Amino acid sequence: MAKEEPPSVSRDLQELQRKLGLLLESFLNNSKVVAFMKSPVGRFLDRHPFVTLTVLMFVTMSAIPVGFFLLIVVLTSLGALMGAILLEGLVISVCGLSLLCVLCGLGFLSLALSGIAMMSYVVVSCLMSYWFSPSRPLTQQNANVDCQLAMKFTESERLIF
């Protein structure tokens, strides 16, 4: 039985060698490979098989680290994109709350200024109607006396209440 296995193994190896030869021939007859082999880089690699093997091994072994690096770059970019979106949302929220506070403050300030303006209008119109009433003519001296009396009257009211 030991003598029967070697002819079978040798036939299998010959078949494998023939298939690899056909594969190599079809590979070398490919138009893109022919164009590459006619280029200066292809001619250099054809004349220097050790360099060709070294480059082939380097490219093969560097595929996994380059793949991991590209994966990390993509994941970091996605993380940065999400971080920028979250940061943008945070900035918009903080600015929105700041704007709300400023607008509320301006609303209260406008209410206070409107109240002061309305009270000033009422006081000035009452004083104008009192000073310049058609029923009694006032002189400058009488107006000053009336203002002083009004001031004393309001001070006495403050003391009473």
UniProtKB/Swiss-Prot annotation:
Keywords: Endoplasmic reticulum, Lipid droplet, Membrane, Transmembrane, Transmembrane helix. Residues 62-67, 111-116 are lumenal. It holds the Pfam family Promethin. Prominently expressed in the heart and kidney. Expressed at higher levels in white fat as compared to brown fat and skeletal muscle. Expressed at lower levels in lung, liver and testis. It comes from the Eukaryota. One of its GO terms (biological process) is lipid droplet formation. Residues 1-43, 88-93, 134-161 are cytoplasmic. Plays an important role in the formation of lipid droplets (LD) which are storage organelles at the center of lipid and energy homeostasis. In association with BSCL2/seipin, defines the sites of LD formation in the endoplasmic reticulum. This is Lipid droplet assembly factor 1. It comes from Mus musculus (Mouse).
